[in-house]
Regions:
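Compositionally biased terminal segments of proteins
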Residues: 1-190
Length: 190
């Protein structure tokens, strides 16, 4: 039942962001499902252009969420009594982050409606960024990277998305000091 509520809220929030012309995309575990891979999740993760942060916050608070943490880089929301689940919002304040939003694929899913989904290459780059910014995230995010590549090699990725861009991933991995980490999983993608 919790997953159904999250899916419903994803649909509602995505519609409202699109209606207000807020540049955003879905990131995190929900994105994996659109690639044809899956992982259980208890929250919805968005990346939003930082220039549209205030209108995005208004949409969330107007949709029954309370912001319990906000910085220049992200905001976290919870719904009263956890009825709608949690939402994490990353603010894209760099050209690279905004480019990820522009590169996202607008999908029209039967149960969810329209939602822009981050490219798989950018999903990996965001995981590397998370590790670079917070070493305590290493076990969880490295596991996610490992599982992504296992699924990618076994099942492939929906053809709606671009193929993995190894050069792009390595460029960001080097920038984030994560080349050694990503080499473990991308040896065959180089």
């Amino acid at each position: 039942m919790a997953q159904k509520k999250l899916t419903t809220m994803l649909s509602i929030l995505s519609d409202r962001f699109i209606e207000k012309q807020i540049p955003f995309c879905l990131i995190g575990a929900f994105a994996l499902g659109f690639y044809g891979l899956s992982r259980h999740t208890v929250d919805i993760d968005f990346m939003v252009d930082a220039n549209y942060g205030d209108p995005a916050l208004e949409i969330l608070t107007g949709s029954g969420y309370t912001c319990f943490q906000k910085t220049e880089l992200f905001a976290q929301f919870d719904s009263e009594y956890d009825v709608f689940g949690k939402v994490d919002m990353m603010f894209a304040s760099t050209d690279a982050g905004r480019e990820m939003i522009r590169r996202s694929v607008l999908l029209d899913a039967e149960l969810i409606g329209r939602v822009p989904v981050v490219q798989p290459t950018d999903y990996i780059i965001l995981k590397l960024l998370a590790i670079a910014n917070d070493k305590e995230r290493l076990p969880k995010d490295e596991f996610d990277i490992s599982e992504f590549f296992k699924g990618y090699r076994t099942f492939g990725i929906s053809e709606k998305f671009e193929k993995i861009d190894a050069k792009r991933i390595y460029r960001f991995a080097e920038k984030f000091g994560q080349t050694g980490l990503i080499q473990k999983y991308m040896a065959t993608e180089k």
